[in-house]
Amino acid sequence: MKKGPESSKELSRNDPCWCGSGKKFKKCHLGREQPPPRPKASVSQNPRRILIKTEEQLEGIRKSSRLTRDLLDMIEDRIEAGVSTNQINEWVHEETLTQGAIPAPLNYGRGKGPRGRPFPKSVCTSINEVICHGIPNEQILVDGDIINVDVTCIVDGYFGDASRMFIIGEVPDATRKLVEETRKCLELGIAQVRPGGKTGDIGHAIQTHAESLGYSVVRDFCGHGVGVEFHEAPQILHYGTPGTGDLMQENMVFTIEPMINMGRPESRILGDGWTAVTVDGS
């Protein structure tokens, strides 16, 4: 998650900019308004405590979620072959700051993330065999790619988290079908959300549809509560048994993020400590 320096005096002109752009401070944010400090509760201090939101909190989460949606709409208007994932990061970063918000992924996990490395960018960009948490770089999108862009912003202390899949140009029929059926998995999961239901109902609906088509469900990552903190309880597994898991209650807020593979469900983490890819390249 992102936090700018308390003041520009913390960085010299030739230091890398705090924003993660890779540019020197003098060429980037020197003399420009810094973002507001991020909330302290970016990671749940009690990961099993499910937060039932108040009406005030729900309105704050709606506001941050609307900005997240708008950022994804902006990407949809601009993304195409020839664009780099760093460009996507720059679009999101600059527009988030312009709106007075904070890009939550930037510097998220400082001292707690994989190998102690904070996430260095403002958005996750996951291409093809990358399951999630891909780090933007100079890779250029080409015809036939599929990419998931995961955006989380903080507005007035509240978190809005969403991702969207994009198809670049013409892709094989099997690839397009995977994207379409993963969307269907999401819709089937959402259809199970109701007060009095169990989170296992969501996972079961997703798993049943995916496996009926010969796909596998990633088990190493899941959806999660969100809103007051970046990651809250409950965990929303994308597989499961009906009638099991946590009780869904009115005013809970959580993400459903089905990750569906053509091949095996297992993942591995690349050397950057964040990027999760399929073990078989599918």
Question: Where do the protein language model's features map onto the residues?
Answer:
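Short cysteine-rich clusters marking metal-coordination/redox-active sites
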Residues: C17
